[in-house]
Amino acid sequence: SVTEKIPFEDVLTSITKEAIIEKTKLFQQTIKRDFLITNPRIAVLALNPRNNEDDSCGSEEREIIIPAINELAAQGIQAFGPYAADDFFGKGYFTDFDGIMAMYHDQATTPFHSLYTEDGVIYTAGLPIIRTAADTTPCYSIVGCNEADETAFRHAIYLAIDAFRNRTTSDEVAENPLPKLYHEKRDESEKVRFS
């Protein structure tokens, strides 16, 4: 998300055009490096509810978010939006994107927890190390009872392994690119061949 885990009253002042651009570029680089997606499609969520054409709920989309998306697009980053979070997750639009940039932490985690109740994985982007975690809460009452579901933990381990392999591959390619070979183009038209 654009903001970290901060009090909700501080969210509005933390959302700036520069912050959106910086976080989205970092997110895009992480997707490219750790998931080997060459040109990721990133959805940018709106801050305010839908049907806000008259700015009655706020003008952040018009003044901050849309200009940031336009600047990202001018830099060649596939950023789309802003999308109202309720429609975006409720209608399944999230399946059409490689990543989602939320404006604040709970805007992304609340629908994620609703969609993936048992096997969700937390992936922290932009770190020099790979960090994954099972998106579960400790349930000490079932410790040692052979009742816990380890699926989320297993998915977190597999994601960490895959991301590490992808990052290693990406870094090797970036360090040792193939040299570009330029050949002069020959004119193979009929006129040249029979002259």
What is each PLM-predicted segment?
Residues 1-60, 66-195:
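Anion-binding alpha/beta catalytic cores of soluble intermediary-metabolism enzymes, centered on
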